[in-house]
């Protein structure tokens, strides 16, 4: 029985990145061997065991054979005669198919170390095309490792395009698509994930609302990059510099969905694209069962992101109505979230990347001033029901008027 460190831990070790989770493969053993040594079996579909002390995952070397459609249609074979090379061959990318022995030696039959040096994401074998989830996984790895200069090997991109054209992506469940997308949104360069999906044709199948933005022009005066799809990718790149909050990042991605359904005869103008985008955001979020908290913010971002660009010119009464509309009194965190989204929208344009966004400062400060109005003093006047609401709104307007007069 031989044990090897495999997968992401070996890859990250070679990249001098922090190693988070360690996975091990066991060659030349049976389930009984590991159970006798105190390992606990956790895998139902294939033999995975938890180490009795470290609780790290140890899997028996196995092969997988395509036996059905989708990413679940595989028959697993695990036995003592499965070699390390057999096990590594079923993995997706060469950089994930390197093993590290107890003697401190790398076993690299598919030249993953060469690809790490060349900064290439390359598939191990043609069996890659048997699992449609790998299209998303490679796009996610591209996003994760883009800051290190990694790109996808041309032959792997061709294979991803073939897989997309085959219709296999339709077998992916909502949960798996969102899980990969969520991980990508946590990466340093999430826009790369969507750019890769667009490049291989998967965006049209999985995220048609986002795909529809590519090729849609916006006025050059406001958008030197012109193409709304390119602008959206720039916004996602910018918002990722401003926050790690996945709800904010996803909402920034969805802020202009309404432009994807503007009639061609109205191009390059998109009047009312904010409210138009709300049902598109709703549909996307329902399809992938995206958490309500993310969905609600994304709908608000679609509807109101343009309001913040002109917040300094708004009447105080309209500013208060905006705070009401986004439920800011009960959810004050939305102020900062929407300010960041609108800032990313303003700066996610060619030539505007380093410009300040004073509207964000104004928006935050206006809320702070309005929120300082004492509700108890209004209630103590003996007002009832809607009269309290009206008086509170008026008082908040006055507070903003007085504050603006001092600016």
UniProtKB/Swiss-Prot annotation:
GO terms for molecular function: ATP binding; CCA tRNA nucleotidyltransferase activity; cyclic-nucleotide phosphodiesterase activity; magnesium ion binding; phosphatase activity; tRNA binding. ATP binds at residues 8, 11, 91, 137, 140. Mg(2+) binds at residues 21, 23. SUPFAM superfamilies: Nucleotidyltransferase (SSF81301), Poly A polymerase C-terminal region-like (SSF81891). Residues 228-329 form the HD domain. One of its GO terms (biological process) is tRNA 3'-terminal CCA addition. Its cofactor is Mg(2+); Ni(2+). InterPro entries: CCA_bact (IPR012006), HD/PDEase_dom (IPR003607), HD_domain (IPR006674), NT_sf (IPR043519), PolA_pol_head_dom (IPR002646), PolyA_RNA-bd (IPR032828), tRNA_CCA-adding_enzyme (IPR050124). Keywords: ATP-binding, Hydrolase, Magnesium, Metal-binding, Multifunctional enzyme, Nickel, Nucleotide-binding, Nucleotidyltransferase, RNA repair, RNA-binding, Transferase, tRNA processing. Magnesium is required for nucleotidyltransferase activity. CTP binds at residues 8, 11, 91, 137, 140. Its EC number is 2.7.7.72, 3.1.3.-, 3.1.4.-. It catalyses: a tRNA precursor + 2 CTP + ATP = a tRNA with a 3' CCA end + 3 diphosphate; a tRNA with a 3' CCA end + 2 CTP + ATP = a tRNA with a 3' CCACCA end + 3 diphosphate. Belongs to the tRNA nucleotidyltransferase/poly(A) polymerase family. Bacterial CCA-adding enzyme type 1 subfamily. Monomer. Can also form homodimers and oligomers. Catalyzes the addition and repair of the essential 3'-terminal CCA sequence in tRNAs without using a nucleic acid template. Adds these three nucleotides in the order of C, C, and A to the tRNA nucleotide-73, using CTP and ATP as substrates and producing inorganic pyrophosphate. tRNA 3'-terminal CCA addition is required both for tRNA processing and repair. Also involved in tRNA surveillance by mediating tandem CCA addition to generate a CCACCA at the 3' terminus of unstable tRNAs. While stable tRNAs receive only 3'-terminal CCA, unstable tRNAs are marked with CCACCA and rapidly degraded. A single active site specifically recognizes both ATP and CTP and is responsible for their addition. Comprises two domains: an N-terminal domain containing the nucleotidyltransferase activity and a C-terminal HD domain associated with both phosphodiesterase and phosphatase activities. This is Multifunctional CCA protein. It comes from Proteus mirabilis (strain HI4320). The lineage of its organism: Bacteria, Pseudomonadati, Pseudomonadota, Gammaproteobacteria, Enterobacterales.
């Amino acid at each position: 029985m031989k044990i090897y460190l495999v997968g992401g831990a070996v890859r990250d070790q070679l990249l001098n990145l922090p190693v988070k989770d360690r996975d091990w493969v066991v060659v030349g053993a049976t389930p009984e061997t590991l159970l006798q040594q105190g390992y606990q079996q956790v895998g139902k579909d294939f033999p995975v065991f938890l180490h009795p002390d470290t609780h790290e995952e140890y899997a028996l070397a196995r092969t997988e054979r395509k036996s059905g459609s989708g990413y679940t249609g595989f028959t697993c074979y695990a036995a003592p005669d499965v070699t390390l090379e057999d096990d590594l061959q079923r993995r997706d990318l060469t950089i994930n198919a390197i093993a590290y022995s107890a003697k401190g030696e790398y076993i690299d039959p598919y030249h993953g170390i060469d690809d790490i040096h060349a900064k290439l994401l390359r598939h191990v074998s043609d069996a890659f095309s048997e699992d449609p989830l790998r299209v998303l996984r490679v796009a996610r790895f591209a996003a994760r490792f883009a800051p290190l200069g990694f790109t996808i090997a041309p032959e792997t991109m061709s294979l991803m395009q073939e897989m997309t054209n085959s219709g296999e992506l339709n077998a992916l469940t909502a949960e798996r698509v969102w899980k990969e997308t969520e991980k990508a949104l946590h990466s340093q360069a999430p826009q790369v994930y969507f750019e890769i999906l667009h490049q291989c044709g998967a965006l049209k199948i999985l995220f048609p609302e986002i795909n529809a933005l590519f090729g849609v022009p916006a006025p050059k005066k406001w958008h030197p990059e012109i193409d709304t799809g390119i602008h959206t990718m720039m916004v996602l790149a910018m918002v990722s510099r401003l926050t790690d909050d996945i709800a904010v990042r996803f909402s920034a991605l969805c802020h202009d969905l309404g432009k994807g359904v503007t009639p061609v005869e109205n191009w390059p103008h998109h009047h009312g694209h904010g409210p138009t985008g709300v049902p598109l955001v709703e549909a996307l979020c329902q399809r992938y069962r995206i958490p309500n908290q993310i969905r609600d913010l994304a709908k608000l971002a679609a509807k109101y992101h343009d309001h913040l660009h002109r917040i300094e010119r708004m009447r105080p009464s309209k500013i208060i109505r905006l705070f009401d509309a986004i439920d800011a009194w009960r959810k004050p965190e939305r102020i900062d979230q929407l300010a960041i989204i609108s800032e990313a929208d303003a700066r996610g344009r060619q030539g505007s990347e380093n410009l300040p966004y004073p509207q964000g400062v104004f928006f935050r400060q206006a809320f702070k001033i309005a929120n300082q109005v004492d509700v108890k003093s209004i209630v103590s006047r003996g007002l009832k029901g809607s009269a309290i609401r009206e008086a509170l709104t008026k008082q908040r307007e006055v507070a903003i008027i007085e504050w603006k007069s001092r600016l």
